[in-house]
Every structure is written in structure tokens, then in C-alpha cells.
Amino acid sequence: MYDLDAVIVIYAVEGNPADQQRALDHMAVLEQAGHRFAISDLTCTECLVPVFGPGSGQRLSDFFRFFHGPNLRTLGLTAAMHARASAIRGRHTYPAVPPAQPKRYGLADALHLAAAIEFGCDVFLTNDNQLANFPDITVEVLP
């Protein structure tokens, strides 16, 4: 099962045409290969922040249609996921650009990774190169 980072969902639902096509094409290939997808409640929250406002009804409907897709599970965040996110932030860093002291993963990224691991996902799909070398789950950067 592939856990989808919020940016992948945003690309798939309303990304610029090139990013949207990349996301939809890659997800279609994965689905044809028999893979299923998961998102967390946090992913839903991140995706919906910019859509709550005047005149955003269609955008909101588009996201909810995606969230209720037949090949997608939504995971509630658990205490175990929060504990693992704390451990990720405490134990893991990524190289800073330009080179400086390594940086700790942000809370949202740590929660996304923790949710994917705790739920038993095989891969975390993102477009964030800073997550690519995280060691506890396979991280795939959108091609």
C-alpha cells in the first residue's frame, strides 16, 4: 500500500497541468499494478486549508471526491503514530541546503511518515526530496 503525501493529493486534484498529469499517471500505473493508497486525516487537513473560503465549493467537492475514491483508505492518527512522529523528529535529520547543520523533520512530515509506518504501508509517495533518504520506510519521489 502506498501512503500519499498531501502534495501528491493536491497535484492529483488541482495541480498545475504538468504536475497533475504526473501525479495521475503515476497513480494509475501503480493502481494497474495492484497497489492501493492511503492518506491520513492530516493529509485531508493540509489539502483543505486553502479551499475553505468564498467561492471554493467546487474545489471542496473535488477533494472530497478524491478522499472517497474506491482505492483509497483514510487513516485516523493514533497515539502510536504521534509517539513514532516524536521519535522520528528526535532521531532523524536530513541534510540542509546549502550545507549547514542537519535539520530535523518538521512535525507534519514526521506525522505523515509515522502514519504510513504504523499503518503498515510499504511506500510513502511524495514530491519532497528532503524525505527521500528517510530510512524506516521506502520513500518514492514522484517521477
Tell what function each PLM region has.
Residues R73-N127, N133:
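Active-site neighborhoods of divalent-metal-dependent phosphate/nucleic-acid chemistry enzymes
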Residues V7-I8, E46, A110-A114:
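Active-site phosphate/pyrophosphate-handling residues
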Residues E46, A132-N133:
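Short catalytic/ligand-binding loop motif for oxyanion handling, primarily in non-cytosolic enzymes
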Residues M1-I39, V51-R65, N129:
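Short, well-structured N-terminal submotif of metal-dependent ribonuclease cores
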Residues V13, F134-D136:
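Short glycine-/acidic-enriched loop or helix-start segments at secondary-structure transitions
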Residues D136-P143:
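Active-site regions of enzymes building and remodeling cell-envelope glycoconjugates
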Residues L24, L42-C44, L48, F52-H92, ...:
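Active-site-proximal, substrate-binding regions of enzyme catalytic domains
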